[in-house]
């Protein structure tokens, strides 16, 4: 629908189609990081391994969507600003920091000391999730004339009904995919934990 039904935007042209994947992926990564926050707090409070595995699953999937947001944002930025990255753009910079936090989270959970990664990863996941509101409000305190980041949805930029239909469909599809991937990654984590438990019992 994004490629076949929605017309080109008058100013940006075909590159505006990136917007549908960019915003939907941002919503997906924010939702996944919200799950990381809840699951990490749950693990630190209860030491329940299921909560830890859910945190890992949501963090890894959220990082994938976070990467998509960063890449599509840079594609749009190159068309709008004639440069891939602008350090003067606070939302882009804060989102890069968010991406780096969850890159660290993913590396830690996959290559760190298994005896320590659960606690350290949970703390890092909470820190990353709490950075999401900072990303969102990072441009709100700037005067309107100084805002480089587009606010298409918030400022009513989707006037054609086909834009709204495509936007709603893209958000639903990407959020559904995100939820499915988190569930599948969680199941893989559970099966891996059970396999390690059985292997440990056999060695005894």
Spell out what each predicted region is.
Residues 1-204:
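Polytopic transmembrane helical bundles with strong interfacial aromatic enrichment
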């Amino acid at each position: 629908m994004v490629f076949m039904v929605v017309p080109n935007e008058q100013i940006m042209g075909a590159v505006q189609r990136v917007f549908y994947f960019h915003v939907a992926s941002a919503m997906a990564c924010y939702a996944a990081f919200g799950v990381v926050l809840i699951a990490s707090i749950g693990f630190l409070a209860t030491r329940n391994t299921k909560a830890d595995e859910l945190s890992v699953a949501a963090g890894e999937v959220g990082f994938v969507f976070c990467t998509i947001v960063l890449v599509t944002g840079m594609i749009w930025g190159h068309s709008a600003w004639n440069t891939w990255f602008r350090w003067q753009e606070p939302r882009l910079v804060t989102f890069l920091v968010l991406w780096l936090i969850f890159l660290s989270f993913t590396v830690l959970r996959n290559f760190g000391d298994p005896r320590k990664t659960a606690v350290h990863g949970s703390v890092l996941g909470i820190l990353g999730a709490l950075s999401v509101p900072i990303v969102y409000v990072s441009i709100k305190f700037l005067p309107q004339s100084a805002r480089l980041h587009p606010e298409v949805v918030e400022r009513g930029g989707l006037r054609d009904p086909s834009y709204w239909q495509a936007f709603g469909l893209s958000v639903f599809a990407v959020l559904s995919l995100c939820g499915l991937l988190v569930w599948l990654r969680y199941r893989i984590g559970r099966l891996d934990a059970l396999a390690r438990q059985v292997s440990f019992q056999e060695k005894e």
